[in-house]
């Protein structure tokens, strides 16, 4: 397919547009069922397990989730899934016991902030709710950017288009505004009620679409001749399928995907409680059953995710698709470079390097591929070299110009001042390369799928991802809206608001969050894999909240002072990590080089990580900060939990009355019967 060729047949457009219009119309019709604030915020707490399950299924499938999954599997394969299954008993026990969910429902709190006020204080309600909303918005604000780039690449849309021949509009901005407008409109129509109903309708479309795509992928590729040889072509220690041969994997490895995830199941169950539809169930039992059913209903989606990742690995690495794969890499890197590199001269050199890159016909096992050396790195290394060479050339020209047009002597070149300028120029080149590489990894799925899918099925795939994007966007925007409106803004009105004003206040907050998402997507530079970016973004809340939430629900000695100290400590640690990680290539590493500290800092990092063997290896890298977000957040959580316990034991003068918070014993409501046992 040529660069100017249209990818959507009219059949594809029909398949895409009609279901989307039906979903929007259904959301619009939910308005007449909103009779009060409870209906708008919590569906009147009338949802049963099956409605919640269907809505949660639609919300679970998302563009950003699929792209993040494919990024991870393309880098580390599928062997970690074996060890991930070891966590199933733990998750089942948590689901069956209603761990954290039951206790939260017993507090009768309708939001996180209300719980924080009941357990700690009114001030910590406002602070904690605002902090969680900010963390949630920072993590989710790249969703419109990921979706816009995805559809631009997949549909081969131009970077700009003319509006009525008067204004040249960036397609990237237009798509972000369009996606956010649709999602926020659904929220304004019916709030949680619209999310649940449209999510259920979308799930009805998603199941047959998913099944069709699974059948096509299995038909398109030969399992024995193409898929398995490609997946098995890895060096020792980085196997894609052998769970006992993964010691050299980085970023997504045994520690990040098993140890950290197991820790999160226990200590982060209550982190995002009270958001989205988690307060819409008519009872805690229905919420628990919806969670259990969700684990089963998502299996079809998991199969689709897995096969798409297998499809991508095979297409981009098997010699039968070498020419097409080279075209994909050229398209990806060219458009990524155009978005990141602002200097026209540098961009021209990079585009020339990309255009000259030949196809790579890799013979299976000769040599085996690895994370450090594979077909993508062979391509990207050419771009990195072009960027660094260009940075040095431009710096030399600037120095010659400052020297009156005379070439610098060896003594001048060796001076610390000149070397510092070279170091920072190299850092800027590394920073640009990191951004290009991130977009390259993020968008390879969209370009690959447009090369593979035929007419009709291509429209079905677009519909699948558009509905996935829509359900996820409105759910996550409303989650942040609910916390911000209920726990930050509403307490500012001591006399409360009328139901009508209350609902309109929530709507305006949702619109404001949509604006925040737009500007965040437009100006935020993503420097890492999506999962690692999300971990970093939510760290300002997640670093300190496990102790505050879980121990707040289960431990009577936790104090308000301990909660304040823990949350503030988590913020300080997280902000420091974010600043270092974001500015590592262009400022921090050049600074360390200037002051001859690279070796000493590298030795210190190696010493700290050495007790963990192959699980954690912190080695100096001029492009990427050695400590990834999973590792940082894990150790930050350990520290803040211990800190919370110590401060609580020091400041606790009287045990907190847990019975009053949970409405037990003499505090139980008169005339309210205990929930009847329900059959499975």
Regions found by a protein language model. Give the residues of each.
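Membrane-embedded helix-loop-helix hairpins and adjacent transmembrane boundary segments
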Residues: 1-680
